[in-house]
Amino acid sequence: MSKIFTRSFRVRWGELDPSGTVSPANYLRYLIETAWDWGTAMGWDANYSQNPDVFWVIRETEIHILHSLRHNDEFGLTIWMVNWKGVRGTRCFELKFKDSDEVIAQGTQQVVLESASGKQA
């Protein structure tokens, strides 16, 4: 697994809440899109994700927003794995303005389950 992966984004108007800033759900969408692209870059494409025996469950997500994102802001989301033990892995991420400082830092706990029994693989 590549240790670090970065993807670029530009904030679209549909990602904003009534206050004109990115809604919390869209920060999670950015994370999922980046994680998906990270997997695809490693060969874990849609065919791999359709494996009926294994699936990913996100147990916990913690996001610290340091600066609000607004329409047309451009930023990169960098993701990396910090720990993998048994069926649990922890990955971190940070968002940085294209030419500036950190926007968000996050840690996500994941677990791989066997779908037939629902037990940890």
What are these regions (language model features)?
Residues 1-59, 114-121:
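Hot-dog-fold acyl-thioester-processing enzymes
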